[in-house]
């Protein structure tokens, strides 16, 4: 990240109405943030007791992770050193789970029929914001370098029924 202090003192909005994907609630709810994982990854997360950055979870260098097909967003190498979070009611995490399942971006039909939801790890934004490695990049609500211990920060885990 080029300028980590740029967004350091940005206040959390109560709701983000510009988001058109969250029609039911009229925008992104900001009291919670979420990390979404496919079931097999969620099992590993629970066994480990922490959400780990990609370099820590997969034990591969950031340059290798950046070149993988699953890194379709052309993310910079520092991306792989952070645990990423979306707003609590955002579908972005489930979209990523489906993208990894299909090997491509899912259509709107695939996000309803045949949809495979991820396991959602919820955190209170204001608590996670106090994590010593939490930063704001102006794109994601929050991201945390290296690791988030579930025992210290998790608020709720939602596992889909099927």
Descriptions of predicted regions:
Residues 1-162:
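NAD-dependent ADP-ribosyltransferases
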């Amino acid at each position: 990240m080029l300028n980590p202090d740029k967004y350091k003192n940005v206040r959390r909005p109560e709701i983000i109405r510009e988001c058109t994907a969250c029609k039911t609630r009229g925008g992104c709810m900001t009291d919670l943030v979420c990390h979404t994982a496919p079931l097999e990854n969620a099992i590993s997360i629970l066994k480990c007791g922490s959400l780990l950055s990609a370099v820590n979870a997969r034990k591969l260098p950031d340059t290798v992770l950046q070149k993988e097909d699953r890194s379709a967003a052309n993310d910079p190498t520092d991306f792989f050193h952070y645990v990423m979070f979306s707003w609590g009611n955002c579908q972005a995490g489930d979209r990523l789970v489906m993208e990894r399942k299909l090997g491509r971006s899912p259509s709107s039909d695939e996000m309803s029929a045949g949809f495979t939801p991820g396991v959602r790890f919820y955190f209170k934004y204001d608590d996670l914001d106090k994590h010593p490695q939490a930063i704001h990049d102006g794109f994601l609500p929050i991201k945390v370098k290296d690791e988030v211990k579930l025992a210290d920060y998790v608020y709720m885990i939602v596992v889909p029924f099927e």
